[in-house]
Curated annotation (Swiss-Prot):
Protein name as catalogued: Regulatory protein VirG
Function in brief: VirG is required for the positive regulation of at least two vir loci encoded by the Ti plasmid of A.tumefaciens.
Segments forming a coiled coil: none
Spans traversing the lipid bilayer: none
Entry's Gene Ontology molecular function annotations: phosphorelay response regulator activity; transcription cis-regulatory region binding
DNA-binding region extent: 155-255
Domain Response regulatory: 29-143
Annotated Gene Ontology cellular component terms: cytosol; protein-DNA complex
Alphabetized UniProt keyword annotations: Activator, Crown gall tumor, Cytoplasm, DNA-binding, Phosphoprotein, Plasmid, Transcription, Transcription regulation, Two-component regulatory system
Amino acid sequence: MIVHPSRENFSSAVNKGSDFRLKGEPLKHVLLVDDDVAMRHLIIEYLTIHAFKVTAVADSTQFTRVLSSATVDVVVVDLNLVREDGLEIVRNLAAKSDIPIIIISGDRLEETDKVVALELGASDFIAKPFSIREFLARIRVALRVRPNVVRSKDRRSFCFTDWTLNLRQRRLMSEAGGEVKLTAGEFNLLLAFLEKPRDVLSREQLLIASRVRDEEVYDRSIDVLILRLRRKLEADPSSPQLIKTARGAGYFFDADVQVSHGGTMAA
């Protein structure tokens, strides 16, 4: 059933979708940015029924206020805000946080808009009209792939050229001591490369490793993640020396990698 969602269709979706509530599922906080009052109310009602805490705001000022005073697990942003560009909210949040960002849009549906949103750090892009039950499923997917706030028990560090990726702290550091922020997808993708240096990895393998949805517009999501990683790692992203393309086969990481297991180095 496709909905935008209307009140009638929404009520039907609630009745049919009540089995989507997972036993013992912790209460997660969804922050919605949408200046459509009716849409805000419908999403709040539906997600609340399915064991989510939802805060809905109409603009970036209210968004920033909530974000600074509460723990947020996933952000949903409508691109088509009347007074501002939703992409700016995405850009600003992705630059300083790994909170998953889901974009919803009814007008800006060109491939360029979707690719730009992904490049800026969005986790998902949903076109209106959409299925409210699919919307719920996408939120759950975004929450599953978010890195844990608690530090990982994996104590490995990967050293390559003048970079170090620390798994316990989930940090990418340069030899000079500067930290480069990575989104969850970028982190997972880089780790996949570092665990198998110089092995050609197919796009399907990389999709699984990075936990990116492989459907519709997301067929290009690996290319987008590769581009973003190259921009962060390579001196000249247009002539990459680390992440290289194997034509017709996938990508490979062309560098020596040393692995430290809590102090012990291994090649």
